[in-house]
């Protein structure tokens, strides 16, 4: 029996096409994935992300524990509410999950992890917390709604109370703040401005309806995937997993190597991989007809004339750009051109940084 979020009936009211997503009944679209995608790029759209897992880490050792658990360093977080993206690695430097950590106080952090990895993540966090003075508490009674797009903040402001709007006024990107019953964060998975709003389940349906009444378009998993791929954001299970280290997943910027004596889980293995050199995750652009897809092989010839092969991890048609884009894991000797094998022939592609659209515009 699939899990249902508190907003399940609201999705049916909007004629959502529901699909199984890692054991959750979630909306794929509400009629037109392209229209939903464009709403987020041009106006405002919203996503039910209540399947995500909210975990509070509280205690005297909360900071020390998270500095051990995560490859990024929560000690960098000095201002209450500041958020940090990074990976949780195993001893071999494989990515168990990618997650966002919010610093609330020195003894209180909030972590949001993926739904597909929930049980594995919670078990790993519980195991690693042994010996630390921390309490790890999952918060299943909290729902989450992401409101994204150039007009998202203005439309959300019409739904928030005056006190809530005052609390978040001037909040910079990648912050979160408790404002009344809501935890409002300037984070997202689309490359647009907006909020991710953590809301008590008993208030979630009313908030969803209020956002609908403001003209915020409901968006499903289909648009969520094309938006995140345009923004060059990884999807766990496709672009990285426990067999992939973060350096090979365009997550090198999330690894805090300094201070050198911080012995985070996976550090030694990751240092060995770094020194040996790893594959890298790049962006591909194909302006010919056709769509780049997961698992298609990528070929290129290096400066010495040697052919190398990689693989597409995520691919789609980009509604914003009007042609196909992809992320691919390839040997790091790749230049600025390559070929992808599709329908038994090789098609030329451009190699770019894995960041295709930012704030509605081409980013490469």
UniProtKB/Swiss-Prot annotation:
The record's listing under SUPFAM superfamilies reads: Aminomethyltransferase beta-barrel domain (SSF101790), Folate-binding domain (SSF103025)
Instruction: Kindly report, in one word, the top-level EC class recorded for this enzyme.
Output: transferase
Disulfide bridge positions per record: none
Instruction: Spell out where the chain crosses the membrane.
Output: none
Q: Name one GO biological process term.
A: glycine decarboxylation via glycine cleavage system
Protein function:
The glycine cleavage system catalyzes the degradation of glycine.
Q: What is this protein called?
A: Aminomethyltransferase
């Amino acid at each position: 029996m699939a899990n249902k979020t508190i907003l399940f009936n609201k999705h049916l009211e909007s004629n959502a096409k529901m699909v199984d997503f890692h054991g959750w009944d979630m909306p794929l679209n509400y009629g037109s994935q392209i229209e939903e995608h464009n709403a987020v790029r041009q106006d405002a759209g919203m996503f039910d992300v209540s399947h995500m897992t909210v975990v509070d880490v509280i205690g005297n050792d909360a900071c020390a524990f998270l500095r051990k658990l995560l490859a990024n360093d929560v000690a960098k977080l000095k201002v209450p509410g500041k958020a940090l993206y990074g990976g949780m690695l195993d001893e071999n430097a494989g990515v168990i999950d990618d997650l966002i950590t919010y610093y609330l106080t020195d003894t209180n952090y909030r972590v949001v992890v993926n739904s597909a990895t929930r049980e594995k993540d919670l078990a790993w966090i519980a195991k690693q917390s042994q010996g630390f003075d921390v309490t790890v508490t999952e918060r299943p009674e909290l729902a989450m709604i992401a409101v994204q797009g150039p007009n998202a903040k203005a439309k959300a402001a019409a739904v928030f109370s005056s006190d809530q709007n005052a609390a978040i006024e001037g909040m910079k990107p990648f912050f979160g703040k408790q404002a009344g019953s809501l935890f409002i964060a300037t984070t997202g998975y689309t490359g647009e401005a907006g909020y991710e709003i953590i809301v008590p389940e008993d208030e979630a349906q009313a908030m969803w309806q209020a956002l609908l009444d403001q003209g915020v378009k409901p968006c499903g998993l289909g648009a969520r995937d094309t938006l995140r791929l345009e923004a060059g954001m990884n999807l766990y299970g496709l672009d990285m997993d426990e067999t992939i280290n973060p350096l090979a997943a365009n997550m090198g910027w999330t690894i805090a190597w300094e201070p050198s004596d911080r012995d985070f889980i996976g550090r030694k293995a990751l240092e060995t991989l770094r020194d040996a050199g790893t594959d890298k995750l790049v962006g591909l652009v194909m302006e010919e007809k056709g769509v780049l897809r997961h698992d298609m092989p990528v070929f290129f010839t290096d400066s010495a004339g040697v052919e190398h092969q990689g693989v597409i991890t995520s691919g789609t048609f980009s509604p914003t750009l009007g042609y196909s884009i992809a992320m691919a894991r390839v040997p790091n000797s790749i230049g600025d051109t390559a070929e992808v094998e599709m329908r038994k022939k090789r098609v030329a592609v451009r190699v770019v940084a894995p960041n295709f659209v930012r704030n509605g515009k081409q980013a490469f």
